Amino acid sequence: MMKAVVDIETDSLDATKIHCIVAQHYRTGETRQWVGKECSQFGEWSGKIDQFIMHNGLSFDGPILNRLANARIKPEQIRDTLIESQLFNPVRDGGHSLEAWGNRLDYQKGKLNEFDDYSSEMLEYCIRDTELTRKLGVTLEEEGRTFSSQAYDLERQVRIIIDKQQDNGFAFNLMEGLVLLAQLQDEQYQLEAQANEMFKPTKVQLKTKVKYIPFNIASRKQIAERLVEKGWNPTKHTDKGNIIINEDVLSTIKDMPEAQMFSRYFLLQKRTGLLKSWIKECQDDERVHGRVLTLRTITGRMAHHKPNMAQVPAVSGQYLIRRLTS
């Protein structure tokens, strides 16, 4: 089987141009390079390779080589050292980047700040990355001896599906989202003003003066103190003895309208936070392309960011915002 370690340098993460490609024979270390217009010739050469060893090759290098270098690399041909690193130990100190592995293997990754145009320094940087990926491949072969090939194949297939999900994103009506955000924020401000009328500032006697601490409706500690003053007898506490205040607890206090007001405020906090994150990440195509890390935790659970799509409210929840995503 012909195996090659491959790395590329492009003009950006959303690449429109490949500046250079470097490939090394996995066993012998024999190196080949393609620069500028030569990159279009990579596709013909790549047809001789059975396995491509790349760091983040499934999500980045492979698709870009297929799109811009006339390659026809299949996902099952890619051995992705990023996925292997995450699979074999999801919580490595320092993370799973090639730079982090360079530090571990005492073969530091190069430094390069300018990617807009090709330079000889860029080629040296790419060569260094390829050499480091080769060393990493050997290291992970040894580390992964107790893992089956099926485990890697499964994670590869999951990554492919998630990449499609990220590329597609979901539709988001930005204008309606902005209107709804303004409505919810208006209600928040009204509840804040109402709370300040209900609960006057707390008087604190200092040595030489009196200090007044205004009521903060977002402070769970202050909410607990004021409800206790009104006769509430809390039954749920943290390990440190602090009173637990959340929507579930507040919803059980039926005889205090203040508790229902606080519960409502917490709901509005969550929904406005969610809306702000969606609005921030909405792209020109009017879609939100949330990022998903498939092997982020020791349990194998996925992690989400930009925005956190794991926090979408249930169908039964208030302000589901379904109309904004249809």
Model-derived segments and their meaning:
Residues 1-9, 13-14, 22, 103-104, ...:
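Conserved "right-hand" nucleotidyltransferase catalytic core of DNA-directed polymerases
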Residues 43-46, 181:
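A generic alpha-helix structural signal
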Residues 47-48, 326:
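Short loop/turn elements that form and flank the Walker-type P-loop nucleotide-binding site
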Residues 1, 48-50:
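A general structural motif
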Residues 14-19, 23-43, 50-144, 152-162:
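Active-site-proximal helix-loop-helix substrate-binding element of RNase H-like nuclease domains
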